[in-house]
Amino acid sequence: MKVRASVKKICKDCKIIRRKGVIRVICITKRHNQRQG
């Protein structure tokens, strides 16, 4: 899980979701998981 100021989709499997007001990117590739901080 990377914490970034701007989260972007990296590949076609990345999905941007909003959980409890936090924007996250979830993906089957574990390296692509991100959270906005």
Swiss-Prot record:
Q: Which domain of life is it from?
A: Bacteria
Stated name of the protein: Large ribosomal subunit protein bL36
In the record, the note on similarity to other proteins reads: Belongs to the bacterial ribosomal protein bL36 family.
Q: Does the keyword Ribosomal protein apply?
A: yes
Q: Which UniProt keywords apply?
A: Ribonucleoprotein, Ribosomal protein
Check the record and name the PROSITE patterns matching this protein.
RIBOSOMAL_L36
Q: Does the keyword field hold Ribosomal protein?
A: yes
Recorded GO MF terms = structural constituent of ribosome
A Pfam family per the record? Ribosomal_L36
GO process annotations (BP): translation
